[in-house]
Every structure is written in structure tokens, then in C-alpha cells.
A protein has these predicted regions:
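Generic L/I/V-rich hydrophobic alpha-helical segments across diverse proteins
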Residues: 86, 93, 100, 116, ...
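Short basic/hydrophobic patches in alpha-helices and adjacent helix-turn junctions
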Residues: 185-188, 192, 199-202, 232, ...
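Feature marking well-ordered beta-strand scaffolds used for ligand recognition
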Residues: 239-782, 796
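Soluble extracellular-acting proteins and domains
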Residues: 749-865
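N-terminal secretory signal peptides that target proteins for export/translocation
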Residues: 1-29
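Short, solvent-exposed segments of well-ordered alpha helices
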Residues: 80, 84-87, 177, 184, ...
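All-alpha RGS (Regulator of G-protein Signaling) helical domain and cognate RGS-like helical scaffolds
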Residues: 50-238
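Bacterial N-terminal signal peptides
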Residues: 33-46
Length: 865
């Protein structure tokens, strides 16, 4: 039986048991006292803590650190790199002060006195700040480690500082010479400061101190502003007429030397925005505008047009200050109307653009006449002509199969077209798209390598992103180790002439592979060559491949390398040699001389949209590099860069050009975007020289609008040039001390073939005409080694050829004497003249052989070699 309590139990709480409640109070007090005692014991009694260690080098013992020392980095708020930067910048600023203090005694030009005054005042103030910053942090005002003299000099040079020799030369100069040296050195000095800032900010944890970061930001802005001012001053010292040309869309100032502008054709309707023909970007909305913007397309477009200063976009409204014009959008519009490259065939000129193609009829002495326009957006619109077929490169992701204007926004679409378009132009007034070749990276440029009645072989160069495999089978991007990648290749395309709709890629060779290991990425891997070099693009594409089929050779300008190929088998190009250059950012295009013994490569530093011809831009960056081809190897000879300074509102860098076919010489006409057109003589590949130019002022006075000349080519006696924004220009060369009337006339007689395509060179020949002989003679006359009476002898011989009374024997003896003299001369033009005189005799002999009434015969002794 269970025992039970006769009375129910109640909870034991203080309310019912006062004694228990008191007990709890006593217990709590005792426990609190014990806790206090324990805490005091822990505080007052040393305990063994876990050690904090800083390891030494391998094999060396670790160092034990106190907690306050271990946390010192985060507590300090600055890094060793910050300290080094400030210490170096003090030295850097002091040299700027030293240079500025030279100004007042060496020039009285107020603009220079103002620059020097600003520099001296600002640099002294900044030195004071930097010294205070270091002192407050218990840091030395100078670097504690003193490198060797040679290392220190190199370190200072990398900071943009002038050498001791340069400072001495500056101190000993006066007037304009001083002004030029001062600005050149000071701009480089300021550029060095910007480089130091950029280097520091790349480092993790640097400039964490808000005061230091604000100082660096202000310093960077101030140095860049001063560079812009000095750039204008330095350009003003130039005696080149191209420096300082007034801006304008249709009314820009012009400068020409040994060239004449014959015609300037604006873009036809449908190939420009009538409300904004200059392509000036819209103004950005001001942050102070509180009203909610109307985001409708109509409102946005209307606002854009209202913000333009004029229909041409020549003027600017709303400038905040002299140095800070109103900001404009940096985004690209859906459609671009930029003119690009050209191709010629007979009397047909095809002008490509991002928007399509314009076909013109050209006749000697006449203004080109528009035949028809093909609207087919897709960029960049490079063109070639083969018979009745017109090829067009398309690269943009918004390009459409149907040439539609609406673009494509879907990530994957069957309507997207990127590759090579093929048009039938047998009816020039009604071109028809008859074929397409889709490619993984689109088509930036293309080269017609070979063609006959059956097929056309084309090399395709894609430089854009690799499209997704879901859109085009076989397109693999940058996946490590995957040899199926579309990178590091060119495409070989076959176009059946009678059925261009069956055009296809027949191979995509890996032309950059390591010839020993077979690794696809076998050439330049990208990056800088050394601490002072240009940053060169990775070689995973070719921008241009210029083919010279008759010589079985091609030159590839392939992003990070210049390459020559053997194309004896057009389907399997074989790399012969590859070079790189510390001054090249992006190997862009290539042109052979007529003999195929030289190649001129261009560097498109800045991508064509940046100002790269300012007074302080290096003369071997964004330039041409000229190579001789010796035993199938590229041998560097020289650089050439546009000598005229351009402004920061002018995109300028080396771009497309072609040979001017003057017999006996290597002459090149070239587009430099807003730098204009330059004609150079590189007959002496070690010493290229400019012999002519044409240039306009910038499109806009305060904003960089991408424009200028895309391409300039010689064709049938005239130079045709596509102006990105303004349209098509036609120019001629004029006689000068560099180029005679006979040489220009001989070039006009040159046989370039029936077709001229941008990346396809044909051997040029000249007829056996007296004017060609006189062109050679003019070249020899310029040489100091030419016999004084040679010109008299040649002219006498040419006169004898036209005189029916002269016997064949007289002509034979005269020829023998002349050719003996010419053959003994070590001069290219002498060899050319000797051969031409023989041709003239042979040509006359052939003519006379068909005339039974002519009694003159030529002895066998003068038979041609």
C-alpha cells in the first residue's frame, strides 16, 4: 500500500516561505563575493597566454610579439608603401620647383611665367603637407635605404624625373629652346607623378588614411590639368602648320603640304543623323536636376537634340569653366554611321561603314558619283571586291541576318549575324545579299588570298568575343586546356563563285602555335615587356593579314606580334617569322613595298579612339615600325610617327594606308584619324621622312568626337580617303622638292591591276614611257653620287628615240654607253632606269618591225638581257 501525504504540498517560494527567501539572499551574496574574488585573482595573478609569433626566413627562429606590436599595422592606418610614396614625391616635387625657378631668368613669356608660378606655389604647399604628414607619424622625411647611384637614377627616371644632364642642358638654354625643353621635361615629370599615384593605388591597403587619399586625389587632378595646359603651350611652340588648327565639323581649318584637296563628299542621306551629323554625344543630365526625368524614347531623343549647340554640333553650350566643359555621355548609340574602309575595281569605289556600303562611280578628273547605298548595320564594314561579288566584314553582336536596323538584344539568337556577308553587285543599282559565313568571333577584317573562276579563298580575322556554342556550334571560348577554342586562330573561307550561298569555313589554323611544342598560345602572352615598356596585347588574333600572292608571302599584324607567313599553299599558311616590340600596344596593319623586301607595321595604341599624338606621347608608341625582310626574317630598321602635335580633342594614331606607286621609291600614304593624312618616303628604311600631308582641325573644340581619316589609298592617280564623320575626300599630290612632276605622272601610269582591295597587294608595273625614265632620272639627280652629265645624256637619248632620222646604230651605241654608266652605279633608280631604257629600245624595235617602209634595224648586239 502506498503512503500518501494527508495534506497537499505547495511550491517553495519566498511568498509562502520567508525563511527560504532569506536563505537565497544570503547565498546570492556569498556567490557574488566569490565571483569578485575570483575575478580579482585572475586580474592580479599572471597566467601563461598563447604566444604570438612572427616567423622569420626559412630556417630562422620565429620572433614573439606583444599584442600591441602585432596589431600595429592596423592601428597605424598607413603602409610602408605610403611612406615610400610620400618620401619619393617630396624629392619629385623639389625637382619641379628647381625647374620652375629657372623660368623667370630665361623667358619673358607670360604664359610660361604663369605655369612656373603655379607649379612652384602648389609644389611647395604640397611638400609642406607631406613633411607634416610624415612628421606626425614619426617617419623620416627621406628614405632610410639609399640605393646605389645607378639604381637611384633608374628609380628617378621611372618617376619621370629629369636626369642631371637634362637639368644642366635646361639651365644652359634660353628663349624658345628653353621653353621647349622646359615643357617637355615638365610634362614628363608630371606624367611620372601620375604613374606613381597609379602604382600606389594598385597596392592592397595603400592610401587607407583618408587625409592621404584626398591629397593623392587632388594631386592627380592638379597634375593632369597642368599637363593639359602645358600640352597646349608646347603645341603652340611648334612651327608645323597643323598645330593649333581651328575646330569645326564642316568649317574646320585646313593645312596642306604638297597635297591638294580635289573634292569632299559628305555622307549620303541615310548614312548620318540629320539632327546630329557630327555624331556629338548628348549632354549628361545634371545631378542638381530634381525633376524626375521623362524616360520615354521620344523625350530622351528630343532632349539630346535640344542639347546640341547647332545642327553641325560645332559649338558648346553650358560650359562650367575654361577647364571643365559640360560632360557628355560616353556610351555608344545603337547605330553608328562611321565610315571605314574602301575597295576599288575599274571605275567602281565601294566605301564601307558601320551602317552599310556606298557604291560610287569614279572617273579621272571627275567628282565620284553615288550609284547606290546598301544599308546593312553590323560594324565594322570592311569591304573587298572580286568580280561581281562584294564581301563585307561584320563583327557587332547587333548585326542581323536580314540587315535589319533594330539590332538584337537576346543573348542567343538565330537572327544574329557575325561573319562575312557576300553581295552580288552585277547590277550596281540593285545589289543583293547572296551568301553569309557565320564565324565564332565575327569578322573584323578579311583578306582575299586567291581567286579564279571556280572559287575565292579568304582569310578571316575575328577580334571580338567568342559567341556561345548554343548559338553557333563549335564556338568554344577561353576554357583552360580546351584546344577547341576559337581563340588563337584565323579562319580560311572558301566561296564558290557560281554559288556563293555555299560559302563556308574550310579550316581554322592555329597560326600562333609554338612550333616546337605545338602549344596554341605560342607567341606573345600579353602584358608589359619591362617596367618602362608599352603594355602589348596578347596574340590570340590577327587584326589585319596583308597578302602578296605573287610573292607567296603575307604579313600579319596580330595584336601582340608582327608575323610573316608563307602562303604558297593558301589553304595552309606557314609562319616564317614573328617579332614583337616594346613600344607597340596592338599590332594593327601591315603593308609591303612593291618589291616585297620590306614591310611597314602600324601600332593602334588606344584603339583608334584616343588622343595619342600629343606633344608628350612617345614617338615610338602608336607609330609605324619598318622592317626589312632578310632571308625570310623580319629585321627592324626604324619607327615613323606623325610629327605634328595634335590636341587632346583629336583621336590620333597610326592607321590604314597604301603604297604610292612611284617607280624607284617606297612611298606610303597613310591615315592618322584626326591627325590627318601623311605621305612618307621609306626608300631608306632606316630614315623615313614625311614628304606631304593634309589635315583639318578637331571636329569639336572641347570634346573628343571619334573621327578623322580611317583609310587613305592611292588609286589611278588620286588619293581617296574615308573620313569617319565628314565623308569621302579626294586628293592629289603636287610637285615639290621631294616629288617631281615626272614622278607623279609616272605613278599615275602605274598598272595596279584591275582591282584594289585593302589587304591584298598586287605587283605594280610601269609602261615603257619616257616620263617614267625621267622619273628615275629625277631621283638620280637628287643623289650627290650621280655623274653631272648623266641627265644630259639621258635626255639626248630620249630625244634620239623620237627622231626618225637617227639610225639604229647611233641609238645602240648611245644605249650601250648609258647602260654601262647606270649599271655601274649602286643605286636602285639607276637599275630601274637602265632596264627601262632597254625596254624603250625593244619596244621601238618591235614597232619598227611591223613597218615595212622603215629602213632602221637594230643590231643583235643590243638584244635585251
Amino acid at each position: 500500500m502506498a503512503c500518501t501525504d494527508p495534506k497537499p504540498r505547495r511550491p517553495l517560494d519566498g511568498a509562502t516561505h520567508p525563511t527560504l527567501n532569506g536563505f537565497r539572499s544570503v547565498l546570492s551574496a556569498q556567490l557574488f563575493g566569490i565571483a569578485r574574488l575570483t575575478a580579482l585573482i585572475f586580474i592580479s595573478t599572471p597566467v601563461t597566454a598563447a604566444p604570438i609569433l612572427q616567423p622569420g626566413p626559412p630556417g630562422e627562429p620565429s620572433i614573439e610579439l606583444r599584442p600591441d606590436v602585432a596589431a600595429r599595422v592596423s592601428q597605424a592606418g598607413f603602409s610602408n608603401e605610403d611612406i615610400q610614396f610620400i618620401q619619393d614625391m617630396i624629392v619629385h616635387h623639389q625637382q619641379a620647383i628647381d625647374m620652375a625657378q629657372m623660368v623667370s631668368e630665361r623667358t619673358n613669356q607670360q604664359a610660361f611665367l604663369d605655369v612656373a608660378g603655379r607649379i612652384e606655389a602648389s609644389q611647395k604647399d604640397e611638400i609642406e603637407f607631406m613633411q607634416s604628414w610624415l612628421t606626425e607619424r614619426d617617419q623620416s622625411l627621406v628614405a632610410t635605404s639609399k640605393p646605389h647611384d645607378h639604381d637611384q637614377m633608374r628609380h628617378h627616371k621611372n618617376m619621370g624625373m629629369a636626369t642631371l644632364e637634362e637639368m644642366q642642358a635646361l639651365a644652359s638654354s634660353t628663349s624658345t629652346d628653353f621653353e621647349t625643353q622646359f615643357l617637355t621635361l615638365m610634362i614628363a615629370h608630371h606624367e611620372g607623378a601620375l604613374k606613381m599615384v597609379k602604382t600606389l593605388l594598385k597596392l592592397s591597403g595603400s592610401a587607407f588614411d583618408p587625409t592621404l587619399y584626398q591629397f593623392i586625389t587632388d594631386l592627380k587632378n592638379e597634375q593632369q590639368t597642368e599637363i593639359n595646359r602645358m600640352d597646349i603651350l608646347l603645341a603652340g611652340l611648334s612651327t608645323d602648320p597643323r598645330a593649333g588648327l581651328a575646330a569645326g565639323f564642316r568649317d574646320a581649318a585646313e593645312a596642306a603640304h604638297n597635297m591638294t584637296l580635289q573634292a569632299s563628299l559628305p555622307k549620303p542621306p541615310g548614312f548620318f543623323d540629320p539632327n546630329n551629323p557630327s555624331g556629338l554625344p548628348p549632354l549628361r543630365a545634371k545631378k542638381s536636376d530634381k525633376a524626375a526625368p521623362d524616360t520615354s524614347w521620344v523625350a530622351q531623343t528630343t532632349h539630346w537634340f535640344q542639347q546640341l549647340a547647332s545642327p553641325e554640333g560645332n559649338l558648346e553650350h553650358g560650359r562650367d569653366s575654361e577647364d571643365k566643359p559640360s560632360e557628355r555621355s560616353k556610351r555608344s548609340p545603337l547605330l553608328s554611321f562611321s565610315y571605314t574602309d574602301m575597295a576599288f575595281s575599274g571605275d567602281l569605289l565601294a566605301v564601307g561603314s558601320y551602317h552599310g556600303i556606298n557604291l560610287y562611280k569614279i572617273e579621272t578628273g571627275e567628282r565620284p558619283a553615288l550609284i547606290s547605298s546598301i544599308v546593312c548595320p553590323g560594324g565594322q564594314g570592311d569591304v573587298s571586291i572580286v568580280g561581281d561579288l562584294l564581301l563585307m566584314s561584320v563583327e557587332d553582336n547587333r548585326g542581323r541576318v536580314d540587315c535589319g536596323l533594330q539590332g538584337i538584344s537576346d543573348d542567343i539568337s538565330t537572327e544574329r549575324f557575325r561573319g562575312l556577308r557576300i553581295f552580288d553587285i552585277s547590277n550596281l543599282e540593285r545589289p543583293i545579299q547572296v551568301g553569309q559565313v557565320q564565324t565564332c568571333r565575327g569578322s573584323h577584317t578579311h583578306s582575299v588570298v586567291a581567286s579564279d573562276d571556280e572559287r575565292i579563298i579568304v582569310y578571316n580575322s575575328g577580334t571580338s568575343n567568342v559567341r556561345k556554342e548554343e548559338e553557333l556550334a563549335g564556338c568554344v571560348g577561353n576554357i583552360a586546356g580546351d584546344t577547341r577554342t576559337a581563340l588563337f586562330r584565323i579562319d580560311v573561307i572558301e566561296i564558290p563563285v557560281k554559288n556563293p550561298g555555299d560559302a563556308r569555313i574550310i579550316d581554322s589554323p592555329t597560326v600562333f602555335e609554338d612550333l616546337e611544342t605545338g602549344q596554341m598560345a605560342g607567341l606573345w602572352r600579353g602584358g608589359k615587356h619591362d617596367e618602362t615598356s608599352q603594355e602589348t596585347s596578347q596574340t590570340n588574333q590577327c587584326h589585319d593579314i596583308t597578302v602578296y600572292p605573287q610573292a607567296n608571302i603575307a604579313a600579319g599584324a596580330c595584336s601582340g606580334n608582327g608575323i610573316i607567313f608563307n602562303i604558297a599553299d593558301p589553304l595552309k599558311p606557314q609562319r616564317l617569322d614573328a617579332v614583337t616590340d616594346t613600344g607597340f600596344a596592338y599590332w594593327h596593319s601591315a603593308t609591303f613595298n612593291n618589291d616585297g623586301t620590306k614591310v611597314l607595321f602600324t601600332d593602334e595604341w588606344g584603339g583608334g579612339g584616343r588622343p595619342r599624338c600629343r606633344t608628350f606621347d612617345p614617338m615610338n608608341w602608336g607609330a609605324n615600325a619598318i622592317f626589312d625582310i632578310v632571308d625570310q626574317k623580319l629585321v627592324f630598321q626604324s619607327y615613323y610617327k606623325l610629327p605634328a602635335p595634335q590636341t587632346k580633342e583629336e583621336n590620333c594614331v597610326a592607321h590604314n594606308g597604301a603604297i604610292v606607286p612611284v617607280p624607284g621609291r617606297d612611298i606610303f600614304v597613310q591615315a592618322w584619324y584626326q591627325g590627318g593624312i601623311s605621305v612618307i618616303d621609306f626608300t631608306d628604311s632606316k630614315a623615313p621622312v614625311e614628304i606631304g600631308y593634309f589635315d583639318r582641325g578637331p571636329i569639336h573644340p572641347t570634346h573628343l568626337v571619334t573621327g578623322g581619316y580611317w583609310s587613305s589609298y592611292w588609286y589611278q592617280g588620286r588619293i581617296y580617303a574615308t573620313e569617319i564623320v565628314r565623308g569621302l575626300d579626294v586628293l592629289t599630290l603636287t610637285p615639290s622638292e621631294h616629288l617631281s612632276t615626272n614622278e607623279i605622272a609616272a605613278a599615275a601610269l602605274a598598272d595596279q591591276g584591275t582591282t584594289f582591295n585593302p589587304q591584298q597587294q598586287q605587283p605594280v608595273t610601269w609602261p615603257a614611257e619616257p616620263v617614267v625614265a625621267r622619273a628615275y632620272l629625277d631621283q638620280l639627280t637628287r643623289s650627290s653620287e650621280t655623274p653631272a652629265d648623266l641627265a644630259v645624256q639621258v635626255e639626248a637619248f630620249l630625244t634620239m628615240l623620237q627622231n626618225p632620222a637617227k639610225s639604229a646604230i647611233d641609238l645602240s651605241f648611245a644605249l650601250a654607253g648609258l647602260t654601262a654608266t647606270l649599271d655601274a652605279m649602286d643605286h636602285r633608280s639607276a637599275k630601274g632606269l637602265s632596264g627601262l631604257l632597254r625596254q624603250l629600245i625593244s619596244q621601238q624595235q618591235t614597232t619598227l618591225a611591223g613597218r615595212s617602209d622603215d629602213s632602221r634595224t637594230f643590231p643583235r648586239a643590243v638584244a635585251l638581257d
